Amino acid sequence: MKMLTSAAAAFTGLAAAAATPPVAVEWKAPETMPAKVARPFYGYLPNGDFLVAGGSAFVDGRKTWTDGVYVRRDGRWSSAGSLAALARLDGVSDGLCCETPQGVFCAGGTDGGKDLSSAFLLSLSGASGSPGPVLSAQPLPVLPEPVKMGAAACDGKRVYVVASKNVYALALAEPGEGWSKVAELPGAPREQHVAAIQNGDQKERLLVVYGGYEVASKMPLYDGVAICLSDVGAGETRAVAPLPPLVTTIGAAFLPSGHQHVLLVGGFGWHGWIDRACKGMSETDPVRLGWQRKVWAYNAVTDAWCAYGELAAGDSPRCGAAAGLRPGKTPESYEILLAGGETAPMRRTDAVSVASFRKVAKFASSAWIVVGLYALLMAAMAVYFIRKKKDENDYFRGGNRIPWYVAGMSIFATMLSSITFIAIPTQAYLADWRYFVMAFFIVGMAPVAIYYYLPFFCRLGITSAYEYLERRFNLGVRLFGSAAFVVFMVCRVAVVTLLPAIALNAVTGVSIDACILVCGVLTMVYCSLGGLEAVIWSDFVQGIVLMGGAVAVLVILILKTGPDGAHVSTFWNVATAQGKTTMFDFRFLLSQPVFWVVAVQGLVSNLSSYTSDQCVIQRYIATPDENATKRSLWFNGGMSVLAQVVFYSIGTALYTHYRTNPAAMDVTMPKADSVLPLFMAVELPPWLAGLVIAAVFAATISTLSANLSSASTALVTDFLKRFRPSMSGRAQIRSGQACTYLVGVLGICAALALSRMESSALFDNFNKYIAMLTAGLTGLFFMGIFLPRVKGGAAILGLVANYAVCFGCEAAGCDVFGVRFHPFLLGGLGLVACIVVSLLASFVVREKGRDLSGLTLRTLAKGANSGRAKASGPAAST
């Protein structure tokens, strides 16, 4: 193994090296604010203004509590009134505050005589005619207990207050309901702790609380506590990684950054606090070893700390400063701000430090060359197939001459796509291997498709899978099924286009919108001109590139984990110790992704893909005969399971790499789905980064082209050709090209809309909606083959029941009659509802009998005609 890893390192040009942060903190020219205060209320307002209110100051050596309110807008500070006028507070400091979508939440603190329990929301009033910002204060319910030097955080809907021992929550939309107790911190009461809300391991939403000091002993605390805020497990607490050695949170700020990081800025050093608070030193004495200059970063997913820069040279470290982090679309548009605070005991400052992030690693020109060469290869293939003389049979059915291994690789590339390349590693990085159970059904469904479904598609001479539905049921069922498939394709095009756009944006900085447009338009042109044969052969090439790039990434990730000679052992030990290899969870729970829940999703989604998805069925009918199709299905099954192993391993390796090298991750990473693309951009050799990005786009193009080709075939065959039987072959091709552009444009628009939505895990949402949208189609084909008594009217009633159950339960938040279940069960519930309602309706709805010869399992001539029947769709026309 050691020789193997050494050879791999030599091949890739990699050696074990210290991780370099992909972005650096870059400080700008200092500013000054109108007052010298420490421990005020502070935060960014929704419009980007920074607010400072109240705080303590020293006047002639005497500590005072102030009520001034100041706002920074576009680098300039101005007065915005007083807390006395806004909130009837003559002076307050040591309060707790956080940013909310409505304004800055402020609560508690002290006025020098007593601890306070008041709470209010400071926001811009919208008044006009004033030269400066105009603020208003919205009163909120008083805290359950007086709190000073506590912490607060907001998840967008609720404000959480962490007092000395208890954690409380208030719903911003319904403040009249008051505060509710969420959890209790372990250990003795504490003060000067910090808190932030961030995305954690196992895709949980966490309230992370760190440090402070014991109220009684004044001894600093280094522990961390994570409180689960997710619907499942809400209020549960667990210990997380302690603070770095000799680092405290006393007087520090805790600022969420990106998708999963929190930055710790400012505060006392350990020796400074011990000298001042625990050894009885006078406040007039200087702090012996100074305060914290470093900026520390905590990753809530990998549960690891690292140093991530420090204050600018010549800038004094400070405690109790007003601090904020305003996110941006790029690292350079982020803003970190430290205003005021104390630089020594009894010494306040009006200094303001402002910083942003600077991207250190960039996509090299050599990487672009590799991507360009790959694009030229695809263009050459497109030109070749465009120049080939083709009729409608070539365009829609590939001329029935595609070799079985090419068709198998095409099915493999179509079913995996960029969703596999980006979303599955993200899933394994954020959670574990529980979703891998779905991969077993890729192979498990292959014999079902081969022995029970494939004969119908191969022997009926159909071009669209939904032609079978008209023969078996009626025209209405065919049209409904085809329309549902096209809608699903639009949704799939959106997700498949968005994922590589996220990748390219993370790697190059090109906007996500531009990436979506380029990828979508190029694929539309390629697919519309080349037809099915071009799509399948490009799938073959892209599938090879996809797997080659994936294996290279996995090898390099493991090489970058742990010391020389211990890469594999470190990878395995860290993964198992942190529970990242968990696959089988046999608890009987409906609300968690346990084995039974994931198995239902795997069964429904793969049964749908093999039996009712035109993308896959189109490849069945592109081979010369039924036996070739069978071989292609077995080939796809083996390749798919191998690919799942590789991509889940990549996700696990990403976790072990960033847990052992926390400084290597970008603290500004906006989405979890960017984790693999960012690794490619920062840590792969340029030529390999180009190859892997090409692989991502290979996956995208293969799936998009398959989606567009199959959707256009369905539209032409089931709608245009069905109602205009006399359409010429040339007219069918032109119509197919137009439909390709139509579906492509709709998918691109959906991708642009989806990119503006908050989504922590696209893979979960994709799996949920694929089951919801296709469960009814799966039920139709199942009933058509296995339940001969179900006819058209009953089948339509079953479809209505399927969508009512799926979308009704989803609208109810997967909580029906007090029973909460995981979204992965929606497809299974819909499928069962479709079959049961149709079967029951068949006893009530009277319908005229149809000739079912060759259309059900009972009437199919076993072993007869394993070749191809003449096409009845577009390809049949001359």
Locate predicted features.
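Membrane-embedded helix-loop-helix hairpins and adjacent transmembrane boundary segments
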Residues: 357-878
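Sequence-pattern detector for short linear motifs
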Residues: 5, 42, 75, 193, ...
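Hydrophobic h-region of N-terminal signal peptides that target proteins for export
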Residues: 9-19
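Sec-dependent signal peptide recognition
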Residues: 1-10
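Kelch-like beta-propeller repeat domains
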Residues: 19-363
